[in-house]
Amino acid sequence: MTKKDIGELKRRFKKDECTFTRMCGAYVDNHKNILVRLNETFLNLETEEFYKYLEIAKKVLSGTVGNNLLNLEFPLAEEEAGGRQQFLMGLKSSDFKNEELLDRFYEMVIGNYDYVGNYLILLFHDAYDVMTKTTDNSKLDESEEVYEYILCAICPVALSKPGLGYLKDENRIGPRIRDWVVCPPDNGFIFPAFSDRSADIHSLIYYARDAKEPHAEFMGAGLGCDPKRTATEQKVAFHSIIKNAIGDDEEDSAEIMMNIQESISHLVEDHEDEVFEETAPVVVTKDALPSLMTEINIPETVIRKIEESYEEEFGDTPPAAEYLIDTKALAANAEKKKALVLEKEVETLKQQLEETKTAEISEDTIETYDVVLRVRPQKVTQIKSEIIDGQKCLIIPLDEDESANVNGELL
């Protein structure tokens, strides 16, 4: 599943291109009771309803692949008789005409979706005639296959905000009646997955609006798929590993974390020419960690601790390098570095101006004195005049890393 696949499906969710055949659903209260069922021919909906439901369907294909959109695979056991994959295949083939199958689906969601409050389960059925494309992406007037799929959206239903309004029957301003409003979906899925412009019956596309809490319990217990962590979850886990290994020093932890992220960012940049949208991104394995941290001066004991925790956390499924990077933090750090470089450049220019100013001594001035000194501004306060053995002397202390030049001769 790629952004290109998602985009191809999503572009069809328009009034003149939409081919949804049916839409059905169930409204569930906070006691997990079904209050209302609906089953409609989608194209017969009133215009306003049509667009509202279409907008909900679009949301299930929104977000970032790998973070809000996950490709979940079915274990072999779920593809056997009685498995969830087989059940979804039957539901898709029924065209939503089998009420018993629909009720079983609603109960499957209600029993395995951990949510407190009212929500609406929506199901859309579609058959997309996938047209053949040439190498330059031009469409040919012939069908490659018919991609038949179901789209599910789970939408919270919340009370509208309290407020004042015009009460027509009483002809006055008063507290308005609060309605139960269907919100954009929190979760959803498309089955089967659409991959390389074809149906993949061994997996589905899972949608999570909140990548921090994607409802992993529904992925596994509800849909029967092997749960996956979102990019956000993987990044949070990785950052926790680093912080726990380094200790309580927040300043050191933040600096080391930033340096590690810069190393990972360079790794991604180095593979830019090799990593394409259609292929798997570069991953960070446990064996790759030492090379990412050797130039950051992290103690060997800390590196080993990070490696152990990393393997325990991610095992045989290492995360993609791009998932571990906080792009906003990296951008802010880059700006900070630029500001520091600029400050140093300004300081150097100031120093050069001071030196030039000191050097601009006229010949008359030089002839007036027997000794003319040119020193850096910070050395002026260290110069003393003392009488030594009856002779007036100038004392200029020199540090170990300092040198002096007298009329072109280095002392």
Question: Predicted regions span which residues?
Answer:
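Extended, charge-rich low-complexity regions and/or helical-solenoid scaffolds
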Residues: R374-L411
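Short helix-onset patch at the extreme N-terminus, typifying the N->h transition
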Residues: I6-K10
